[in-house]
Amino acid sequence: MEAKTDAPISPAPTTNPPAEAGKEPNASSNAQANPTAAPGAPPSGAIAVGQSTNPVAQQQQQPAVAKKPSSETNNMPTRQYLDQTVAPVLLHGMQALARERPTDPIQFLASYLLKHSNGCDENNASAAAVDNNS
């Protein structure tokens, strides 16, 4: 968290040094050496933090674009979302758990959910076929 608090602070102090750097004779050589950093920026660590925040900001913007297709699920109510996505697979997993009664029920349910999380409709059809055969 400290990196996040340092990132917004580092650009603010660098806005004042350019005015002071103009009074210094070596200000132009500093500006040419570090074009992305302010001429009077104190430590190079602050520059690295400032530069690392730009890719982080870009990465934060990119997932927002990637999440737009899933906005359909974000717009539906929580109950409806859970009923459509989680409940069917979880229900079948709980039924299998009750039938088999394994010694480690949490591990059994976790592995069941991972195995059957791809397609709930396919699982419903196969579970119905297994129940009919029994």
UniProtKB/Swiss-Prot annotation:
UniProt key word Transcription: yes
Tissue distribution of the protein: Expressed in larval brain, gonad, imaginal disk and salivary gland and in adult brain, testis, ovary and salivary gland.
Keyword Transcription regulation: yes
GO biological process: chromatin organization; heart development
Region (Disordered): 1-81
InterPro entries: Dpy-30_motif (IPR007858), DPY30_SDC1_DD (IPR049629), Sdc1/DPY30 (IPR037856)
Family: Belongs to the dpy-30 family.
Protein name: Protein dpy-30 homolog
Protein source organism: Drosophila melanogaster (Fruit fly)
